[in-house]
Every structure is written in structure tokens, then in C-alpha cells.
UniProtKB/Swiss-Prot annotation:
The keyword Ligase is annotated on this UniProt entry: yes
One GO-annotated biological process of the protein: cobalamin biosynthetic process
Entry keyword set: ATP-binding, Ligase, Nucleotide-binding, Purine biosynthesis
Family from the record: Belongs to the SAICAR synthetase family.
Lineage: Bacteria, Pseudomonadati, Campylobacterota, Epsilonproteobacteria, Campylobacterales
Pathway: Purine metabolism; IMP biosynthesis via de novo pathway; 5-amino-1-(5-phospho-D-ribosyl)imidazole-4-carboxamide from 5-amino-1-(5-phospho-D-ribosyl)imidazole-4-carboxylate: step 1/2
Catalyzed reactions: 5-amino-1-(5-phospho-D-ribosyl)imidazole-4-carboxylate + L-aspartate + ATP = (2S)-2-[5-amino-1-(5-phospho-beta-D-ribosyl)imidazole-4-carboxamido]succinate + ADP + phosphate + 2 H(+)
The name this protein goes by in its record: Phosphoribosylaminoimidazole-succinocarboxamide synthase
EC number: 6.3.2.6
């Protein structure tokens, strides 16, 4: 598969065209961003770790019949993916209260939620990725049919159950995570983007040590060392 011109560059990845119009290559970057890119950094090797972790988790989901854009990992930093049209919604799934949820609702940090919470955020950096509901999605023209929103919610909950059980076996708590979905050439809604410590909050079950991008957000030390530990555990 030939890697051709760059189609898009985001905060954590670059997308490249290939000799197949329906397939792209995602190249994972070493860049670190937080607070809507107000805080920026870089750590060598971070992109390769995210690529490897995402590949393991996409393959896990495939074994549970979850449709994703993932085809295969090409090398340490490149992933072959189906080309999709991204739905501009960040689907956030929360199992434990932390971050913005505690500030917004006054819930104690680290509290286990009585039920899984699924939230939608409008993907727009200029607006600060605001929290939105089903009606907002329709008014904005992001989603036209309620059935499509129900697919996003249902898929998010299924993915949560699979990942939560998997990470639990590896001694990790899946606190919360962000998903992005897209539509393939046939119009099917499938999981896209990545699943990594950049997009998931992962805490050690015994110590509650943070092994995710909060290490960068909160100046807790090396991101790479934490991501290496996550990769080590999920490969066991």
C-alpha cells in the first residue's frame, strides 16, 4: 500500500491518502496537547506507543464484532484504516467521576458512577467542544435521524463493557474515554480515530496511579513511561 499525500493533520495524527481511494494511513504523532491545545508538548516515542495500544484494542473490539475503521498496523507508528467521514461529535463514556464532570456537577473526584454516563460534545475547537444533547445534534445538522444517535449511544456502551472488562483483567480502571465515529463509503456508522491513553483515562487498580494523558495535563511526570506500562499490561 503506497503512502501518498497528506490529507489532514490533527493534534495526535496525520492522515495520508493511499493508492486505494477508500483506504488511508494514520500516522501517530509524538505531540501532546491539553486544554484545547492551550498546553502543548512532545515526547519521543509517544506516537508509536499509541499506535501499538490502539491496534491491540481495535483488534480486541473486532473479536467482539464491533465495526471499526481499523484494518491493520503497518509499522510502529502507521495504521491502515478505512476512509470515513467523521461525525463531528466526541462521544465521552464515563464510569468514574473526574475531570470536567466533577467541576460541572459537584460530584466527588473518584466516585464510581451509579450507571455508565454517555455524553456528546460538539467537535469545534473555536467553541471549546461544548457539551450538547440529542436536540442540539439535530439543530446543528450533525445527525438527522434519532436512530443514528441511538447507534452512537449503543455502540459506546458496548465498547465500554468490552474495554472495562479487558482493562480490569490487566489491573487497570477504565475511568472514562472519548470515542469518535464516522461513516464509511456505504454509509455505515463505524468506530474511528484511536483508543489509547491519549483518549482514555486509565488508573492503576491498586494505587489509582494515573497512566494516561493526565500525566501531561497535571505535570505528573513522563507520559511515555506510563504508556509503556499500559502496553506491557495489555500484551500479557
Amino acid at each position: 500500500m503506497e503512502k501518498r499525500e497528506m490529507l489532514y493533520e490533527g493534534k495526535g495524527k496525520k492522515l495520508f491518502a493511499t493508492d486505494d481511494e477508500h483506504i488511508v494511513i494514520a500516522e501517530f504523532k509524538d505531540d501532546l496537547t491539553a486544554f484545547n491545545a492551550e498546553k502543548k508538548g512532545k515526547e519521543s516515542g509517544k506516537g508509536e506507543l499509541n499506535c501499538q495500544i490502539s491496534s491491540v484494542l481495535f483488534e480486541l473490539l473486532a473479536r467482539h464484532n464491533i465495526a471499526t475503521h481499523y484494518i491493520k498496523r503497518l509499522n510502529m507508528s502507521d495504521m491502515l484504516c478505512k476512509k470515513v467521514t467523521i461525525i463531528p461529535i466526541e462521544v465521552v463514556v464515563r464510569n468514574i467521576a473526574t475531570g470536567s464532570l466533577t467541576k460541572r456537577l459537584g460530584i466527588s473526584d473518584g466516585s464510581i458512577l451509579s450507571q455508565t454516563l454517555v455524553e456528546f460534545y460538539y467537535k469545534d475547537d473555536a467553541l471549546g467542544d461544548p457539551l450538547i444533547n440529542d436536540e442540539h445534534c439535530k439543530i446543528l445538522g450533525i445527525i438527522k435521524e434519532q436512530s443514528q444517535l441511538e447507534i452512537l449511544k449503543s455502540q459506546a456502551r458496548q465498547i465500554n463493557e468490552i474495554l472495562k472488562a479487558f482493562f480490569d483483567e490487566k489491573g487497570l480502571r477504565l475511568v472514562d474515554f472519548k470515542l469518535e465515529f464516522g461513516q464509511d463509503s456505504a454509509g455505515n456508522i463505524i468506530l474511528a480515530d484511536e483508543i489509547s491513553p491519549d483518549s482514555c483515562r486509565l488508573w492503576d487498580k491498586q494505587t489509582n496511579q494515573k497512566l494516561d494523558k493526565d500525566r501531561f495535563r497535571e505535570n505528573l511526570g513522563s507520559v511515555k513511561v506510563a504508556y509503556e506500562e499500559v502496553l506491557r499490561r495489555i500484551l500479557v
